[in-house]
Amino acid sequence: MILKKLKISTWSGDATNCYIVFDEETKETMVIDPAGDVDKIIEIIDILKGNVKYIYLTHCHGDHIGGVTELKEKKGGKIIIHRNDAEGLNDVNINLTHIIDMPEIHLEADSRIDDGDKLHLGNLEFNVIHTPGHTCGSSCLYCDTEKLLFSGDTLFRGTWGRTDLPTSNFRDIIDSITNKLMSLPDETIVYPGHGKSTMIKEEKPIYLELRKKDY
């Protein structure tokens, strides 16, 4: 497996992490949260000689989906998102493109996934983990063989995603992290939607403390 990370400047003013996952044997490629800078994304895909199979969206916010339409038009791939966020792709009041000074986005998902679904990329298997909180349909992707997690805006290094936005909920995000993500192996590397990577073992003390306080 080859993993590439791009920090993409967005209209929200906060760089979004876009990830390109490439299976070397089959050349199947997955792009996670193509927020923009599509030419840069395509440049990497072309260098790898990759074939885009999936465009995976961890949630529906504009700063994660800004490059989806152009990427799909140029490289193909199925647009995948959790079913609870699928409608938000086509609703500017939920994807927030009307308030973060970017062109309005209206998208349709090719596939609406659920908790426990699996995606196969060549020899790699990814488990879908529904993690409501930042949005009602936020999801993470976990690969057990590689011990890596793409956490979107659910889990960050030292903190969690915002819960003051449409369909977000503070208790839900804490429950998602505490009861689902913190049960993953300690050595799991976490690749978030913004900021630096971390590991599950580095984040556990925060959520153990929150559990004690009965959040």
Which functions belong to the PLM regions below?
Residues 1-5, 97-101, 122-124:
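Short Pro/Gly-enriched beta-strand edge/turn motifs at strand-loop
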Residues 1-48, 140-152:
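Conserved beta-strand hairpin/beta-sheet module of binuclear metal-dependent hydrolase folds
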Residues 7, 22, 114, 120, ...:
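Residue-level detector of conserved, well-ordered beta-strand and adjacent loop positions
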Residues 25-26, 36, 62, 85, ...:
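Short, glycine/acidic-enriched loop or turn micro-motifs at the edges of active sites
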Residues 30-32, 54-56, 128-130:
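Short catalytic-loop micro-motif centered on adjacent basic/acidic residues
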Residues 36-120, 205-209:
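Active-site HxH/HxHxD metal-binding segment of metal-dependent hydrolases
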Residues 94-98, 125-215:
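Metallo-beta-lactamase
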